[in-house]
Amino acid sequence: STGESQELPVSTRLVFKNDKASGLGVALPAGRVRVFQAETKGDTLIGEAQLRHTANGQSVHLDLAQTFDLNATKKEVKSTLSDDRLSYTETLEFTLSNAKPEPVNITLDDVLPRWQDWEIIESSHDWSQLNAQAIRFNVAVAAGKTSTVRYTVRYRWPSGNKP
């Protein structure tokens, strides 16, 4: 509902291409992958994930673990149903916080669940369409800072399918 913030989980995702340029380029069998970060006092486990069978040339996306120094909240700022009840407009706001000592790039995916006929009529950031009902924002957030993503979507229903 309007005005209430919803906490969203934030996870660390490792994305790479299975090719020779990335130091791979062979078929990778399915199985558990553990990712470590090299540090002066030894390696630190960042997380682990299940890898699916991956052919040479395919992209790999591994969701490693929930991170606690990045936070995200979602809030509906405004919503309006048209007088003829054939369109619904809502403004959503995401607050992305980075408590890390270095800048990060956050990929924010959002689902547009109300209807397949939608249009983004205003947005604070560039976005791309993932599929018929989802969009993606790529947001750079400076170290110790917060960034706000805000967009307005208008859904339209055919006259026989009013909400």
Residue ranges and their predicted role:
Residues S1-P163:
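Long, intrinsically disordered, low-complexity accessory segments associated with secretion
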